[in-house]
Amino acid sequence: MPPEVRGNKRAFFDISINGEPAGRIVFSLWNHCCPRTVENFRAFCTGELGKMNGHYASYQGSVFHRVIKGFMIQGGDITHGNGTGGYSIYGRTFDDENLALKHKKPYLLSMANRGPDTNGSQFFITSEEVPHLDGKHCVFGEVIKGVEVVKAIENLETGNEDKPVCKVEITHCGEMVRKGDVVGNAGAAASEPEPTGVKMEDEPKTRNWLMRYSKSPESREEKKKDKHGREEKRDRRRRSNDRHGRDRRSRSRSQSRDRNRRRDDRSGRDGRVGRNERDDRSGRDERRDDRRSAPTKDGIKVRGRGKLTFLGGRTRSTTPPHWKREESKKLTLEAHQKRQEELEERQKRAAQREKEEAERNARLEKERVERQNQRELERQKQEAERELKRQQENEESGNRRRRRSSRSGSENDESELEEPKNRSASPRKRSSSSSSSSSSGHSSDSD
């Protein structure tokens, strides 16, 4: 689905790493696919809802609390800052909206949750394709600018629970409006007719509401005449006031000189000043000196006619909290240099660890290859031994068969030799038997 079909809203984060500006991340929000989720994220970006649940409903000042290289960066915990808090603009949590969208490319904006229908304010930005999250987390936007900032956060050193060692803070955030929309609204406002005949340039330069023009339309000529007439009257009044003021000042100076002269004459006639008058005058002088050098609340004496009276009540507006936060981030040159040295030292340690890790991986790979070669040699040796043993067994079985065949052949030869002997022995037996019978006959005859 093309981006213009998914949504047309934009939001941004201004990121700082250890108090140093790192850049801006701009998001394209898919409000056509996930309107509730996008509205929740947009409201937290603008902070338009103010305070909710005892915390300001804004991502400003929150941190990225979890960073996993090759996977994602996670933030949005506006209450605790460690991944255990947060809430939504609809309540504690709200339901999953569109789980059909896939995590099929990097730098997608998705909602973090603790299970089905537990979306709050936490979110994460993927750095790789993560299909195992499909159907579990709602994708509602993507990064369209500031990929290098996401990579910089992803490559930070992390500690326990994948928390980055450096503080990654959202210093400013909000919604972006396209220029075409602003120009269109301005043109529409300019094309609207004015409700009255009074122009902005004809309004009087006074704050008194009762001295303003009436809203009835008048001709341009009459307005100019009235304007010139008022200016002439104002000039005449100013000149007369200046003249009367000079007269009053001159009369007051002459009267003060006359009073001083009469006082001096009386003092000359009396020859001395009474004790009570001296005491009153000294008391007035002391009180005047006290008023002139009255200390303020912080103990600083201010010279003048009296104490400062404009420090009593605070009538001005208070300093905005984000100004105070920015003011607290000011660093001295020594602190900045120390921070830079610590950063360089961490970078060196990280580079050293990477080097050691690469060496260890190379060593392990070499050992693995050697073990594999050794196993291959042992396997070949065992196969050679089995083949040799098989050959020896074959030779022994052949020898046994040959011996058996030779033995059977010799037995056959012996049996063949015994048969003629038996044949030759049988006539001898017959002849011996006949001779014995004849001898027995002869013996009987002789008897």
UniProtKB/Swiss-Prot annotation:
Q: Which UniProt keywords apply?
A: Coiled coil, Isomerase, Rotamase
Q: Where is the PPIase cyclophilin-type domain?
A: 12-175
Its catalytic activity? [protein]-peptidylproline (omega=180) = [protein]-peptidylproline (omega=0)
The GO annotation for biological process reads:
protein folding
Disulfide bridge partners, by residue number = none
Which residues lie in coiled coils? 326-401
Q: Where is the composition biased (Basic and acidic residues)?
A: 215-234, 255-301, 323-399
Pfam families from the UniProt entry: Pro_isomerase
Locate the compositionally biased regions of type Basic residues: 235-254
Q: What class of enzyme is it?
A: isomerase
Question: What Enzyme Commission number(s) does the record list for this chain?
Answer: 5.2.1.8
Region Disordered, as annotated, extends over 186-447
Q: Which family does it belong to?
A: Belongs to the cyclophilin-type PPIase family.
Q: What does this protein do?
A: May catalyze the cis-trans isomerization of proline imidic peptide bonds in oligopeptides. May play a role in the protein folding, transport and assembly.
* Entry protein name: Peptidyl-prolyl cis-trans isomerase 8
Task: Give the organism the record lists.
Answer: Caenorhabditis elegans
